[in-house]
Amino acid sequence: MKDVVFIDTSIIVEYLLNGPKADFAEIVLSASSTNVTSTIVYRESLGALAMAFGREKFGIKGKHSLRKFIRKNGWAKFEPVVEALDGLIREGDIVVLQDFQGTSELKSIMKKYRLMPSDAQIALTCRNYSIEKIATFDSDFKRVDFLKTMGV
């Protein structure tokens, strides 16, 4: 059976923006493992990529400016961002899992591992699906004893 690796937001964004660690991200994404991610990672990635694209193309300075721009113009101008993310998921055969929804478990993970809610949600989803490996550049996941981190 193939290894299952959870792909975190940092790997996706680094790869699509061709950042300094994009080579490692490419190795992870092209490995023979079964790569999975979750809806929260999709959402985070879309937001980070839209921000980077908006800064470069439209001079957007921060989250508030991005929200204002989208409120006025919609998502049409960000279609290249959506297409890039969807293309990576499709071509990379990345399975998008539904996040585990349990507030008491979420709070427990947040407290035990000192994580922000989104990171705790990712860890909880990994635990719920029995995923032991996470590809990430976020060192906070090193504190999670049931996950083996790749990349940090």
Residue ranges and their predicted role:
Residues 1-64:
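Short, well-structured N-terminal submotif of metal-dependent ribonuclease cores
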Residues 20-24, 40, 97-101, 117, ...:
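Alpha-helix N-cap and coil->helix boundary residues
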Residues 55-83:
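Helix-adjacent hinge/juxtasegments
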Residues 31-32, 91, 144:
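Structured helix-beta-strand junction loops
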Residues 11-12, 41, 102, 121-122, ...:
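Alpha-helix capping/helix-boundary segments
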